Amino acid sequence: MSDIELHESAIPKELDSPVTTIALYNNHLYFGTEGGDVFLYNFSNFQLNESPELVKKISLVSKSRVNRILAMPFLGAVFIHHGSFAEVYKEDDLTQLYPSISFKGLVEFCHPGQRIDEKSTYLIVTNTHLKLISFQKDGIILVKNELKYPNIQTARVNGHIVCLVTENSFELLDILTFDTTPLFPIIKYDSENNGLMYKPMIVLHSNEFLLITGSPKDAIGLFVDSQGNVTRSTLTFSFYPKHVFSTSHYVFAISSSSLQIIDINTLSLVKSINLKDDESFSFISRLTSVHFCDRQIFSKFSAVNTASTSKTSDTIERASFSKPSFIFLTNKSWGFGAEAHFMNKLEFSITIGDIEAPLRRVSKRLRNPKKYGITNDVAYLQSAYLEQISALQYWKQGQYENSLSLLETSKIDPRVVISLYPDLYHSELSYIAFQGVISFRKSILSVDDTVANVLKSNELFRDTDQYTQRQMIEITKENAYIMLMRYLKNYKKNTSISEYLLSSQRDVMLAVEHSLLLLYLNMDDLAAGTKNAKELLESGLTGVEDIKDVLIQKKEYYLLSVLLATVRDHDGVLQTWKKLITGDYEDRRFNDGLIKIREYLVNDIEPSTFWEFTTWLCKHDATEGTRVLLDKTVSGSISAEDVLEHLDSSQDDVLIDYLVKSNSVTHRALLLKLCVNKLLGSLLDHNDFKNRLETAIETFRELPCMEKPTYAQYLEQLWGDMSDFSTHLSFYYLCSINLMENVEEESIDKIKDILFDIHVDNLYLFPQLEHSFYKRKKNYEKALSVLVTNIHDYKGGEAYCLQIDDVYPQCWCNLLEKCISTGDGCSDFIKELLYRRPFSYTLSYVCEQIPDHWNLNLLADFLCILQKRNAERLNESQTRLTLEKSLSQNLEELFMAINRRNVALGKNEI
């Protein structure tokens, strides 16, 4: 009770006469005045700071001071004692319940016990009598007992025992037997002016009576039982009380300027409350079964920056209910006296660091609200409030894991937490929160100062060197930021949101996304920060434009492109990447730009945008450009005709690669033309390659004829040795040769101009290409000449003759002649040729072609084969002649035998 608080409200403006008494029951508030008026107000909301609603005002006939208004719940009425009169009025409209009955000469009216809810019997004390009467609902008043007993100043009844005060002493009276028991005299004090006497008091406390008497300076109180025995030590007051009442544990007494609360067991002063200088107490009375809304708690629970609904207001009001111990009246105000709200007590414990016990207590209320007489909504509200306060207190103490756990369950506005980090928080950021949470938040310093304060209280920190202190500060700050990152990330993933935040859901998510992005951008681990930021941007944002502005301001162009991709701004994505590749933008997060463009272009993009950036990519990286075209062709998005339409002549490399890999049969002629033109035309830019080819051909020509391979075999090795040059040239060469062998006849004619007019000067460097051209044109002599005459490819020439032997038999003679025309170096090959193809030549022809200065020994093998062949032929002729003679003889003998057989058969028949 030491934390008792007074909750005051101004006296309603309608009361123009001094107020003398007050009563509250069943949502009805009554004021009695010095002039005999009674005011009835509705007080259903229990809002002390709001003016109650005036229901009715009555003026009593006596015009006397209203001494007391006592509730009579059994009758739904109030007993109004004014001057020496009293009547019973209905509680809701102040009409008389017993119009014909008025109590006169009344001194005291009281109930025989502490609880009056279901009782109808009351003690009436008049100037001359004591009466125990019963009020009936049917309008009848029964007098149970009556005793003539004049000059009673005050009395209280407990059961059938009445404690009363006469002019001289306290006495006990049995109202049933009329037996009296004198107790002790009262203290009389006569002032110098008008003989003023301080009236003794009797307070009923459980089964005891507290008897009070004394002087203006002090007073004493004695506790006696129903037999008159003193039950406790003497109670002393530092003033003579104006009013006194008791509860099971305390005695409350008021003077004009102060309220004293005394422990009834120890009889020691617990607390003294003094009024302001211009105020004075005039009345105090005990209250039971009454609740009121504690405005301080109501204010704490009220959410700032959001409109409340009737449901939320009602929940807040019920969560703020406090049970007062008494009602009081001063010359300027009225109100309740109540212990500090349990929420204030729990919050105080939390703010001094004792967090777990209050959380356990509120958790019990949340699990079983009916047990505590509250609704689920009230229990949730109280729990959420204390959890939010606890989360902030844990953060303040540097206990970030505990703080994180409570932040996620308490449904706090994330912007409250964000505001603790100045580098993420901007001044225009507002948040929706309990007023009490906002007030507590204002008492917490920013993250830097809070971390410093936490560590300063650490003895280990104080005893270490400055370098280690700086390290500890940085680590603790990092933990604080990690906690925030985890909290905001989880909040972003969680789709549920508190009801009171629904109206500001967009603003909340904007703040969360903005802060998360800044946290990721500030991460020391660039890869992890980029990954997290990318996931955030791709998760779906509430404020795309706001985040876009942040990324532009921070020059985070790669992440900007990620954001643009989420809204399908294809042109924006590709333009950003293009500028990063060309150096107009710089961003350390960006890499593999050309690959990224290629992968992005495979998506479903507007044709104009696709071709704009595909052609750009082809110019900067033919390989990646070709891959895009191939992928889109395979998917059916584009055709070869589309590619031919959009690629210009400067992109022949890409077009060739595309046509080859797409295996476009209908465009082989174009491909052949492109390859040949590219191959021959590129030599202007590749002098080293041209020189290498010339050297290679000359080297091949000079190789010993029997050791050299075919030129085709030699060429394969050549490309391997020339890997330092553009591999495209070798590709064009080989592709041209392959296409020359497979394209239609009319396609061959289309490249004639390229070969023999435009690039004729370079054609000699590519003998296989020239040979293939003549071969397809069936110009066998020219085709053979290219191989043998031009490059001395004797083995290649022989292989070619084997291919055309059936259609061009004279090729062997051409081969021999062209080989001999190349000089003496081919003699060994001719020797082998004559040996392998002896029957393709006549001896006379060979002798005519062989130069005179050549050694005829090279013909030895050739002549041997011819001689052997002639011998075989002669032998075959002689054998044939012998066989013919033998056959003729055999036939003759056969015919003779047949004739003899026929003659014999004829004779038998006769």
From Swiss-Prot:
Gene Ontology biological process terms from the UniProt entry: autophagy; endosomal vesicle fusion; intracellular protein transport; late endosome to vacuole transport
Main location: cytoplasm
Function: Required for sorting and processing of soluble vacuolar proteins.
Domain of life from the UniProt record: Eukaryota
Gene name, Swiss-Prot/TrEMBL: vps3
Family recorded in the similarity comment: Belongs to the VPS3 family.
Compartments it resides in: Cytoplasm
TPR-type repeats, residues: 69-101, 383-416, 554-587, 674-710, 712-743, 763-797
Organism: Schizosaccharomyces pombe (strain 972 / ATCC 24843) (Fission yeast)
Protein name (record): Vacuolar protein sorting-associated protein 3
